[in-house]
């Protein structure tokens, strides 16, 4: 592994192929998609999170990594900040944002990059936890979303995680979900 030039104490780079990026983006879209309805219940006419998931799917299927894809991630992130949203809906939008942003994972051996690989899954699980606690979805909470994310992770997700340090501490409830999923996928 080579160090990133001109940056003291920069993390080493890792191998990261375009096929792996596409698989990770598709996985992230699959994780975010089931919770989109939580957002759409609160703001039915706001398509930003769904557009972000759709853009991630286009990239995963072989489409180009464009500025529009990056903008869809930012738009979903901004949608999560709408004041009228329930906490579950906000995390659903964050899951969508992470799905589109997964195409921009950096090839750095940094624990922070784990959050980019698993962020959509963790935010989707948190959205389900919050919706379940509020009695608005009929799911068993975030455990179901984490189990789905673990069981449906493609080989590329596990392979890339194996090149990265373990998920970092912190990040509140979503950070705890990232660490739990990271640990489950490394076993």
Can you say where each PLM-predicted feature lies in the sequence?
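Structured binding/interaction patches within domain cores
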Residues: 2-140
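Preference for long, well-ordered alpha-helical segments
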Residues: 109-187
């Amino acid at each position: 592994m080579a160090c990133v030039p001109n940056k003291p104490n920069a993390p080493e780079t890792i191998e990261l192929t375009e096929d792996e990026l596409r698989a990770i983006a598709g996985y992230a879209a699959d994780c975010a998609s089931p919770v989109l309805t939580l957002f759409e219940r609160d703001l039915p006419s706001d398509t930003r999170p769904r557009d972000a998931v759709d853009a991630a799917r286009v990239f995963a299927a072989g489409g180009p990594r464009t500025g529009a894809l990056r903008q869809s991630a930012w738009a979903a992130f901004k949608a999560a900040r709408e004041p009228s949203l329930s906490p579950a809906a906000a995390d659903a939008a964050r899951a969508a944002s992470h799905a589109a942003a997964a195409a921009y994972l950096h090839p750095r051996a940094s624990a922070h990059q784990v959050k980019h690989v698993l962020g959509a899954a963790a935010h989707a699980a948190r959205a389900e936890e919050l919706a379940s606690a509020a009695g608005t979805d009929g799911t068993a909470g975030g455990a179901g979303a984490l189990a789905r994310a673990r069981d449906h992770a493609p080989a590329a997700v596990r392979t890339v995680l194996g090149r990265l340090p373990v998920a970092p501490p912190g990040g509140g409830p979503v950070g705890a979900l990232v660490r739990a999923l990271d640990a489950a996928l490394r076993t």
